[in-house]
A protein has these predicted regions:
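Acidic/His metal-coordination segments adjacent to aromatic residues that form catalytic metal sites
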Residues: 101-110
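Acidic/histidine-rich alpha-helical segments that form the ligand environment
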Residues: 109-150
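Acidic, carboxylate-rich catalytic segments that either coordinate divalent cations
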Residues: 138, 162-181
Length: 181
């Protein structure tokens, strides 16, 4: 949870270079994107490496993966962005969204959802997957879906490192992590 009053690297403001302006016609110019917009090459490399398209995972599976990774990495910024823009579209209840913030919460999920949470936990804890767990994953996911899950988890760990290291302030209207009791 960030307590900074401003991001460590200030976001760029309009007018943006033409190549970036063209991208902002298609995606919301969030604070993270605007920080990266300070350099056209970094912006393009980052945005082009995304996984928000229709891939081998359902919207729900993709967003559960992202929310779980962001929660485990304590990236309030990115977790809030995905709750705000995607959680309802993916069909998550408020209780399910809250569950993503609980460490080792796979017991709160069932089926493929539980496997996704366990996979995120395993990779967060050890950056490897035990052979018996891989066999379990292979029984439930196609190879390309597993490959996409691994890439998605890696991508969002990168995003979390970036957002946390930059101490990005939450986006307007994005939910925050609950305060500890």
């Amino acid at each position: 949870m960030t307590t900074a009053k401003e991001s460590r690297i200030a976001p760029a403001e309009a007018p943006w270079p033409e190549s970036i302006q063209a991208r902002f016609q298609k995606l919301t110019p969030l604070r993270l994107f605007r920080v990266l917009a300070r350099d056209e090459r970094l912006f393009a490399r980052f945005v082009d490496g995304g996984f928000l398209d229709r891939g081998h995972l359902s919207l729900r599976e993709r967003e559960l993966t992202i929310l779980t990774v962001c929660a485990r990495c304590r990236s309030e910024y990115e977790w809030g962005v995905h709750v705000h823009f995607f959680a309802k579209k993916a069909g998550f209840s408020e209780a399910e969204i809250a569950s993503t913030l609980k460490p080792s919460a796979s017991a709160a999920w069932s089926g493929r959802d539980a496997l996704i949470v366990r996979l995120c936990d395993a990779l967060q804890d050890r950056c490897e997957i035990a052979e018996d767990f891989w066999t379990e994953l292979r029984a439930s996911f196609a190879e390309m879906a597993l490959l996409e899950l691994l890439l998605l988890i890696g991508k969002y760990r990168q995003v979390c490192i970036l957002t946390n290291a930059l101490a990005l302030l939450p986006e307007k209207d994005a939910p925050r992590f609950p305060l500890p009791a």
